[in-house]
Amino acid sequence: MTLTKRVIPCIDVDLDDDGEPAVYTGVNFEELAYTGDPVEMAKRYNEAGADEFVFLDITASAEGRETMLDTVSAVADEVFIPLTVGGGIRDTDDIRETLRAGADKVSINSGAIADPSLVDRGAKAFGSQCIVISVDARRRFDEQGQHYTQVDGESCWFECTVHGGREGTGMDAIEWVQEAQRRGAGELFVNSIDADGTQDGYDVPLTAAVCDAVSTPVIASSGCGAPGDMADAYDAGADAALAASIFHFDEYSIAETKETLADAGYPIRAPDA
């Protein structure tokens, strides 16, 4: 049986100057601009027919603070599709509290790289289906990696970064996703710092490299500018494609995106299904 390909909107949430949660968009994990209210945007995407919804607290890890659980709870009250929440999750207590706030899945990046056993413990305590490992990867054109791919005629590898892309780790992203799979991750959420916010398309070489390395479902993220970019991600092996700007700024609707993909032959759930 052919598995349905998923279309997933995402909101990046930070605290505004008054300390209130707000949605922001940026380019290459920088140049953040106010976009809207997280609860209102969640409600909008739920009603629009999204397959899932992702809420990322984009500064919790870097600032060493807890995830905005009150806001997560308010968002969970408005969405009746699977909700993934990431940002600031460092241990199993954080996972538990995030799930209690209404998340169906948690996305972990920095916390899992700092302590890889968190993947094992999270999967054992809550089930692999709850544990999404997020990878914020960037291209490196040097000889310090382990797995190389060709990009525009040059050989590069993909480095894992932490704390919202602010710090490199020296860790090869392909090595890490394979380890995360072995430890029990139920899904992999692959972000490209190079493509983020550009709307020039996903980093297809990155997506393909991850999909070729693992059997765990992969969500492609960063760089979507049109439904055709999602098709490219699916062709590279992704099970789901995540987008932000094209939906936030009404460049494409969820319904229009799904119709375009379905017409192109991809197995897509209808918005009103």
UniProtKB/Swiss-Prot annotation:
Main location group: cytoplasm
Entries under InterPro entries matching the protein: Aldolase_TIM (IPR013785), His_biosynth (IPR006062), HisF (IPR004651), IGPS_HisA/HisF (IPR050064), RibuloseP-bd_barrel (IPR011060)
Pathway involvement of the protein, from the record: Amino-acid biosynthesis; L-histidine biosynthesis; L-histidine from 5-phospho-alpha-D-ribose 1-diphosphate: step 5/9
EC class (word): lyase
Active-site feature positions: D12, D136
EC number(s) per entry: 4.3.2.10
Family per similarity comment: Belongs to the HisA/HisF family.
Subunit structure of this chain's protein: Heterodimer of HisH and HisF.
Stated name of the protein: Imidazole glycerol phosphate synthase subunit HisF
Organism of origin: Halobacterium salinarum (strain ATCC 700922 / JCM 11081 / NRC-1) (Halobacterium halobium)
